[in-house]
Amino acid sequence: MHGNIADQAERLEKFKSQFVFDPQYSLWHGVERECFLVTGDDTYVPRAREALTHIHRNAWSRKHRGRTLSVDTRKCVGFELSAVQLETRTPPHQLHDTADYLRLIDINLRSSLGEVGLYARYDEVAPKSLPLDVYPDPRYLRITASMPREVLSAACRITGTHHHVGMPDHETALRVYNAAAKECRKLMQLGDNSHGERLRIYGIVKPDYMPRPYDSWMDFCDDAHESGFADDVRSNWRFIRITRYGTIEFRMFGSTENIDRIYSWVRLCHAICKDALP
């Protein structure tokens, strides 16, 4: 701990205020999938901005209980650090809807990309020859401004599947996080399809990727200050983390086209979180 008791309390509350929880979404899910953009001859191309401009012109539709619902593509498809990558995101949903949302986004993404001569490729690791263009987002441009080329290459060459599980409040989130952290190495093995190459490359970008257990939110706050993410919790890049959106995020899984495989990861993470609830 640092400073007097009043300073510690203020410091802790400032840190905790970054995390917003909504009890109605407890044990709800969200899945993020990263992919590379390639042309018909499998050439990796930095065309994320062009692709997003095209995708965001139209809404996608979803059939639900006999009705056709509109899906906002701006919420479902976004950019990554690499201009060769896109990220898709499901809306918050319950476990039984996961596979349907993944298929809905997959079908629509492939169709939209095909209209501009692009394809989604779900490699865990791209070749060393991958273009290193950074998406023109101020945050990513700032992050990469002084980044060594080796680190930039590593950051651009790997993609993953990230899974969020909603939590009702701060204390429950910390309890579930600690339980999940114990399972991290097992989940890393389950989510690897590159014989450890993606994990090795990720270690070049962020060597400190293993989640740490915390005795309390003050313990978490102290570590955040020491590790440099206290003022922006998005900068915590460990494989399991509590997010500002009030979720436990599992970040160790690689990219894959196989939706059934992703759903198996989601079910396992759901069980880990549910079993840890008080």
Question: Which ranges hold each PLM region?
Answer:
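Terminal catalytic/cofactor-binding subdomain
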Residues: M1-R149, R157, G246, D260-P278
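Loop-rich catalytic cores of soluble enzymes, especially ATP-dependent carboxylate-amine ligases
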Residues: P138, R142-V151, A155-D260
